[in-house]
Design a protein with these regions (language model features):
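Internal alpha-helical transmembrane segments of multi-pass membrane proteins
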Residues: 75, 79-97
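Hydrophobic transmembrane helix segments
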Residues: 28-55
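A loop-to-helix transmembrane entry motif
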Residues: 51-66
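Membrane-helix boundary connector in multi-pass membrane proteins
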Residues: 102-120
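Membrane-water interface at the C-terminal end of transmembrane alpha helices
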Residues: 18-27, 31, 127-145
């Protein structure tokens, strides 16, 4: 009789595959919500530069780029951080808060006529994208390494 031993290995969860899927969903949702906001009368035009409105696909592009940066952070934390999940969540929440600051501080300073509805909508779109991407990526990360 021969005995066999089975090695138990924990398969790493795929951060990239799920992260890219969440990125695509977040880009589509934020673009759709930006379109709805435009149709509802929210202006994405800077009164100081009315000839340069924020293009609708700009929402998709920026959501995609910055969500992919989040996917990259998750992949790095999965390999390097002692507590990947909590490190990722804390880092991304700080980055989310920092991304909202210009909507309420810098933009109105440069253009005092910038509508509050625009600032709130832009901030809301940041939160929506984060609410889609962060939980998906966090669920793919181990609690501890």
């Amino acid at each position: 009789m021969t005995s066999t031993t089975t090695e138990h290995t924990t398969a790493r969860k795929s951060v990239w595959k799920h992260g890219i899927a969440a990125t695509i969903v977040a880009a589509a949702v934020t673009t759709g919500l930006a379109y709805i906001a435009m149709r509802a009368g929210v202006s994405f035009v800077d009164p100081a530069k009315p000839e340069i409105p924020i293009p609708l696909l700009g929402f998709a592009q920026l959501t995609f780029v910055f969500s992919l940066i989040g996917v990259g952070l998750a992949a790095i934390f999965a390999r390097k951080a002692r507590r990947p999940r909590s490190t990722f969540i804390r880092t991304t929440l700080v980055l989310l808060a920092l991304s909202i600051v210009p909507d309420f501080v810098e933009i109105p300073n440069f253009s005092p006529d910038f509508a509050p509805a625009t600032a709130w909508t832009l901030a809301g779109l940041h939160v929506v994208a984060a609410a889609i991407v962060i939980p998906v990526l966090a669920s793919r990360l181990a609690e501890e390494r």
